[in-house]
Amino acid sequence: MAGRVREVSHSSDQSGRLPAAFLRPGSSSFTDFVREYSPEILPATRTLPAAAALPGGGPGAGEPPHATTIVALVFADGVVMAGDRRATAGPMIAQRDIQKVFQTDEHSCAGIAGTAGLAVEMIRLFQVELEHFEKLEGTLMSFEGKANRLSTMIRANLGMAMQGLAVVPLFAGYDLDAGRGRIVGYDITGGRSEEHDHHTVGSGSLFARGSLKKLYRPGMSEAETVRVALEALWDAADDDSATGGPDLLRKIWPVVGVTTAEGYRRVPDAELEPVVEAVVAGRRGNPGGNPGISAVHGDGGN
């Protein structure tokens, strides 16, 4: 840290004024600025050492924690995103209450799957990127602009991904120009695709997607959409050991975010608890079975 301070001070003049790079007009991208001024602190510039294993000899030693299942669903007024709370390192549970869904600005959010530490760092940098743009331009970045900017950041991580440290976010938000909720999925190269109705990423995504295909329907209310998201995470946890289900003993619930024209809000745990209990009650006696449309929507399947 001391060396870093000395490096910055050497680039300033004796009057204590900011370096010229801070005052020169240029891109409204914070990442572009850092790449020009101090590129070594960007995650994309790092490389793994020849021996990357971490100390320790137990199961999962040498493996970084991985975040797993994220689901996103469009509903009548916007979009819902939910993520389980488990992080794994090999066969071990590394963390039981990790947060995988983050607000990125007033009208968008992102969920993370893949290498947890790098994924969280990427989303934090993305948050700063959007805030920096807003301060310089005096307006929010468009939904398309945000999706493209995140794509560029994922592509910059390709070197780490090819070494086994992939980051695969899921981006969603309310498009103020289009007046609707939207979901964008990515691959490890930064390739992006518009996802319609719903999408899932992570190790349990196959099982969550199967659940969503049965339970999702267009035009659902916010409450129905939250319930369907929790049902999908339950199905993922039921078949994927890296996805954590609701922890009733510790009262650890999935993180659920809702984004509408009014903005983003995280659904409070107190609001989620009765919904989780309803999901558990609906699966009692048939934990692996589908609760059915009528159980979720309360309409007898009509």
UniProtKB/Swiss-Prot annotation:
Instruction: Identify the propeptide residues.
Output: 1-67
Q: Does the keyword Protease apply?
A: yes
Regulation acting on activity, per entry? The formation of the proteasomal ATPase ARC-20S proteasome complex, likely via the docking of the C-termini of ARC into the intersubunit pockets in the alpha-rings, may trigger opening of the gate for substrate entry. Interconversion between the open-gate and close-gate conformations leads to a dynamic regulation of the 20S proteasome proteolysis activity.
Reactions accelerated catalytically: Cleavage of peptide bonds with very broad specificity
The positions flagged as active site in the entry are 68
Primary place of residence? Answer: cytoplasm
Q: Does the keyword Cytoplasm apply?
A: yes
* GO aspect biological process, one term: modification-dependent protein catabolic process
In alphabetical order, the GO MF annotations are:
threonine-type endopeptidase activity
Q: Which Cys pairs are S-S linked?
A: none
- Region annotated Disordered sits at 1-21, 283-302
Q: Note the CDD domains from the entry.
A: proteasome_protease_HslV (cd01906)
Where's it found, cell-wise? Cytoplasm
Q: In which pathway does it act?
A: Protein degradation; proteasomal Pup-dependent pathway
Q: What does this protein do?
A: Component of the proteasome core, a large protease complex with broad specificity involved in protein degradation.
HAMAP family reported for this sequence: Proteasome_B_B
| The protein, known as | Proteasome subunit beta
Gene that this sequence comes from: prcB
